């Protein structure tokens, strides 16, 4: 019944996309090699730099592996000329002073000094300060003005002594030692100054209480005995913090490019119209992007491991796997997210590379300047690029100094654990946001979904059953199933089709009314019908009028329906609903006996679409292109090749089946578009402007191909060429402002809406300027009107009641006396009918 095929094909969408993508990548070998070579070149540069640095500075290893003698560590014998600072805030009189000339008093007078002839002074001596604040200000000022040449004990103090308490009776001294720790301001270790200061004060107090200067106290500072192993500094890992972020993220702009390219070239739209599910599109795109990323990871990690870079061969291998796996997933979903904002590949590519370069440098500044000794705030990890770059930098730095973290170190307090966690969260969140934005953002082709589209299934569950019944459409294979259009939040601007927004109903043409009554009353043979449209309506939110308004239309087997209308009249919206791109606001349609509201999956198996412009992957061959769409339609694998070859023969492309699409001529590409529409035993084909941009010679050839196609199929043809519609169509349907205005054969419409006949008369060349046939014509028919005249050629419009045979005899009888060279008769053209029907269409006006 309905002419539907008994074959129930199961769509092989994953298989179709897998082989298409795999073949496309195989053809893009150069591009793939470049994608892999860029990170590989960066790693090779890292290897070269590593060898060069090691050759310049030699082995960066200490003499380890032996028992260190603790008593030889930080020994102090003597220091060069210098001075010490003393602070006596409590004004303890017994502290005294010690000057560079050897004079002194109190406790400090017993400090042992050494005379330096070169300076003509004794060392060490004390410079007193009244408070710690004054001393600090002085030291900071000296450091601010210090140069490399002045960094010595001659300008900066050896140490500072802060005296807190001195009790002579109890023989107790409480003091604090302050020594220089910053290496740029000192040529000796910090411990050496501490030992010197302690020795000096111990000797001083002993001499003070013993009453003489003969006592010398010496002590050393040392560690306990230990085995010191060789500490390897991995230059490659240290530098990897800058190289690896570039190497492992340079592929992201290409991910963005590939998605935007398929949107820009309408490849995704065509695939969706041919039955591809958007979820399957994203899933397979995800899989192939991750496959490319995996190949790059294998090369980068493999080369790095061969040369023993610590970041990949030491530490926790499982943690590194989790880290790289998290980055791959988050990078792909982040590229999905970014792709939703672009319509052109050029802008997408420039932005992608710019973002990678900026993010790497921004992370370097923030990680090593702002967050060097602290953890960044949580929002820092919400940008996958920054999170990955910081993690890679930290691992590279730690592994570079032989401190690669083991698995036991990955607690929540360890920042790398947080980075890995947030990368997985980023992957999920950006995927959901990308899928949402892809549906709701404005697009170049098609209409975006309502921002709350995801609530439709929930609202449908709570829809009142009585409202469901009010929209029930019985008949066909729908079996009386109810259809309910979601209202309230999502379609608050929906309208009442019956009263047409309160406007006065326009009186329908009798042919349109007859078509409508035939469909409503089921006065047709279902076996002869391939498409039945029943009250189909589409009203976009925010627009005052529906794009398609209560449309009733039928298409028979073997019929070519010329579906005409001005731009914006509703043609594309109607076809988009029939092919499943849009859902109707109300009404329905049956395609091959299947309801577009419920059975779109099966409908896609029996329909084909040839869009206005040739839409192909240029690097696929004719066979590979058709195999992709054949698999989308669900043709069994054992029949794929046979089906494709049969279609290629039907459109005369079998001899060039292995030729790449980019090598085909314009006419061949157009025929390949028809072949795409025929895949999967399509019984209904939609042709959108089939001969646009084609030469007149190729156009005639394409028309012959279309006439051959209609033998076993129904075709719905949209075109702006009235000649094309006149030649190809079995019937013409003209739509204006969303409503069907007229329907019938070409001759019927010309006779019904035409203004009569058109007659063109040419005057003999010698008499062009002296003879005008207008007076002769008006004598025959006073109602005749001159519509055009140029260079001896005159065109007249005659009323419908004109007897053409009488006019012909009249012109023959006056041919010689009025010097008439030739004349021709024509009925009102289809273009005249179209312009007359569409005269009130505001899309034209």
UniProtKB/Swiss-Prot annotation:
Entry's Gene Ontology BP terms: lipid transport; sorocarp morphogenesis
Predominant subcellular localization, coarse grouping: membrane
InterPro entries linked to this entry: AAA+_ATPase, ABC2_TM, ABC_transporter-like_ATP-bd, ABC_transporter-like_CS, ABCA, P-loop_NTPase
Keywords from the named record: ATP-binding, Membrane, Nucleotide-binding, Transmembrane, Transmembrane helix, Transport
Gene Ontology molecular function: ABC-type transporter activity; ATP binding; ATP hydrolysis activity; ATPase-coupled transmembrane transporter activity; lipid transporter activity
Transmembrane domains' residue ranges: 33-53, 192-212, 235-255, 292-312, 318-338, 347-367, 417-437
Chain residues that bind ATP: 565-572
Subcellular location as annotated: Membrane
Gene3D superfamilies: P-loop containing nucleotide triphosphate hydrolases
Domain of life: Eukaryota
Signal sequence annotation: none
Membrane topology recorded in Swiss-Prot or TrEMBL: Multi-pass membrane protein
Residues in ABC transporter domain copies: 531-762
Annotated GO CC locations: intracellular membrane-bounded organelle; membrane
Family: Belongs to the ABC transporter superfamily. ABCA family.
Protein name as annotated: ABC transporter A family member 9
Annotated organism of origin: Dictyostelium discoideum (Social amoeba)
């Amino acid at each position: 019944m309905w002419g539907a095929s008994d074959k129930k094909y199961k769509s092989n969408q994953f298989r179709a996309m897998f082989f298409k993508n795999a073949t496309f990548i195989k053809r893009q070998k150069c591009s793939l090699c470049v994608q892999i070579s860029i990170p590989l070149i960066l790693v090779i540069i890292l290897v070269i730099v590593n060898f060069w640095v090691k050759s310049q500075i030699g082995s960066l290893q200490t003499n380890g592996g032996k028992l260190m003698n603790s008593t030889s560590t930080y020994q102090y014998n003597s220091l060069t000329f210098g001075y010490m600072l003393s602070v006596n805030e409590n004004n303890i009189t017994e502290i005294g002073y010690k000057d560079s000339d050897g004079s002194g008093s109190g406790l400090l007078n017993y400090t042992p000094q050494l005379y330096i002839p070169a300076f003509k002074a004794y060392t060490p001596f004390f410079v007193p300060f009244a408070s710690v604040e004054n001393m600090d200000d002085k030291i900071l000022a000296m450091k601010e003005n210090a140069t490399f040449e002045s960094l010595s004990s001659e300008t900066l103090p050896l140490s500072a002594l802060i005296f807190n308490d001195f009790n002579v009776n109890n023989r107790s001294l409480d003091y604090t030692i302050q020594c220089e720790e910053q290496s740029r301001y000192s040529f000796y270790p910090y411990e050496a100054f501490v030992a010197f200061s302690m020795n000096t004060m111990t000797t001083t107090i002993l001499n003070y209480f013993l009453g003489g200067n003969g006592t010398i106290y010496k002590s050393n500072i040392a560690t306990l005995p230990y085995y010191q192993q060789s500490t390897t500094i991995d230059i490659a890992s240290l530098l990897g913090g800058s190289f690896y972020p570039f190497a492992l993220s340079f592929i992201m702009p290409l991910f963005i490019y590939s998605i935007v390219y398929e949107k820009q070239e309408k490849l995704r739209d065509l695939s969706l119209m041919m039955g591809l599910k958007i979820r399957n599109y994203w899933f397979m795109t995800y899989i192939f992007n991750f496959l490319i990323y995996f190949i790059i990871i294998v090369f980068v990690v493999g080369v790095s491991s061969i040369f023993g870079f610590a970041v990949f061969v030491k530490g926790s291998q499982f943690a590194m796997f989790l880290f790289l796996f998290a980055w791959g997933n988050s990078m792909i979903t982040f590229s999905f997210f970014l792709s939703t904002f672009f319509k052109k590949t050029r802008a997408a590519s420039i932005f992608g590379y710019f973002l990678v370069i900026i993010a790497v440098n921004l992370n370097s500044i923030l990680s090593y300047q702002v967050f060097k000794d602290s953890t960044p705030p949580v929002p820092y990890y919400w940008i996958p690029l920054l999170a990955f770059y910081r993690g890679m930098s930290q691992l590279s730095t730690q592994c570079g100094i032989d401190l690669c973290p083991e698995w036991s170190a990955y607690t929540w307090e360890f920042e790398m654990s947080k980075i890995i966690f947030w990368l997985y969260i980023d992957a999920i969140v950006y995927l959901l946001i990308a899928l949402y934005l892809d549906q709701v953002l404005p697009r170049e082709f098609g209409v975006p979904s309502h921002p709350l589209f995801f609530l439709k299934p929930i609202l449908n569950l709570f829809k009142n059953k009585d409202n469901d019944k009010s929209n029930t459409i019985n008949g066909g294979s729908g079996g009386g199933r109810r259809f309910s259009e979601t209202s309230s939040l999502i379609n608050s601007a929906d309208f009442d089709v019956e009263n047409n927004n309160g406007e006065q109903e326009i009186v329908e043409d009798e042919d349109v009314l007859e078509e409508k009554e035939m469909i409503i009353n089921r006065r047709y043979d279902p076996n002869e019908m391939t498409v039945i449209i029943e009250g189909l309506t589409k009203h976009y939110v925010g627009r005052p009028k529906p794009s398609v308004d209560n449309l009733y239309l039928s298409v028979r087997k073997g019929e070519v329906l010329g579906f005409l209308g001005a731009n914006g009249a509703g043609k594309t919206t109607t076809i988009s609903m029939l092919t499943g791109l849009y859902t109707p606001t109300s009404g329905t349609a049956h395609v091959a006996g299947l309801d577009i509201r419920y059975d779109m999956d099966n409908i896609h198996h029996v329909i084909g679409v040839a869009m206005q412009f040739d839409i192909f992957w240029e690097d696929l061959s004719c066979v590979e292109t058709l195999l992709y769409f054949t698999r989308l339609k669900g043709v069994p694998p054992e029949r794929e090749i046979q089906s494709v070859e049969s279609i290629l023969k039907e459109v005369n492309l079998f001899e060039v089946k292995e030729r790449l699409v980019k090598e085909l001529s314009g006419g061949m590409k157009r025929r390949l578009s028809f072949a795409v529409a025929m895949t999967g035993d399509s019984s209904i084909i939609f042709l959108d402007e089939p001969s646009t941009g084609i030469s007149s010679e190729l156009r005639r050839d394409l028309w012959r191909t279309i006439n051959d196609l209609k033998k076993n199929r129904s075709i719905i043809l949209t075109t702006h060429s009235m000649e094309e519609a006149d030649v190809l169509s079995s019937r013409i349907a003209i739509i204006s402002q969303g409503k069907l205005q007229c329907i019938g054969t070409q001759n019927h419409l010309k006779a019904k809406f035409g203004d009569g006949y058109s007659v063109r008369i040419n005057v003999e060349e010698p008499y062009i300027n002296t003879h005008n046939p207008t007076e002769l014509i008006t004598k025959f028919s006073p109602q005749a009107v001159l519509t055009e005249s140029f260079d001896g050629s005159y065109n007249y419009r005659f009323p419908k009641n004109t007897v053409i045979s009488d006019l012909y005899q009249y012109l023959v009888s006056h041919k010689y006396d009025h010097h008439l060279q030739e004349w021709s008769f024509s009925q009102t053209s289809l273009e005249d009918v179209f312009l007359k029907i569409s005269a009130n269409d505001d899309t034209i006006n």
